[in-house]
């Protein structure tokens, strides 16, 4: 998955969690938000690289959530983009 796609997924996690860390979002909701529907033949989402960078984490129930580091990273990215 491209870096651009991963950043898009971080934005989706932000929106669906209302900008809160540790709020689980089901992968199906992430898929829907990025335009991947039921039966999509593309490669399944691999969010591990976001976890490897401590920006998101997989919760025990199988959902994904932003970490506090992910929240801080997104806020900084948005501040820099506004300049």
Say what each PLM segment does.
Residues 1-21:
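Short alpha-helical segments that sit at the start of domains
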Residues 20-34:
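Short acidic, hydrophobic short linear motifs in intrinsically disordered regions
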Residues 36-52:
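Short amphipathic alpha-helical interaction segments
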Residues 51-61:
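A short, conserved structural fragment
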Residues 62-68:
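Minor-groove-contacting beta-hairpin "wing" of winged helix-turn-helix DNA-binding domains
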Residues 69-83:
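Short, amphipathic alpha-helical interaction segments positioned at domain boundaries
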């Amino acid at each position: 998955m491209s870096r651009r796609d991963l950043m898009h997924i971080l934005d989706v996690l932000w929106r669906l969690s209302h900008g809160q860390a540790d709020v689980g979002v089901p992968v199906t909701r992430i898929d829907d938000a990025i335009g991947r529907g039921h039966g999509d033949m593309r490669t399944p989402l691999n969010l591990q690289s976001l976890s490897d960078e401590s920006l998101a984490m997989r919760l025990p129930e199988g959902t994904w959530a932003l970490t506090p580091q992910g929240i801080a990273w997104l806020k900084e990215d948005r501040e820099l983009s506004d300049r």
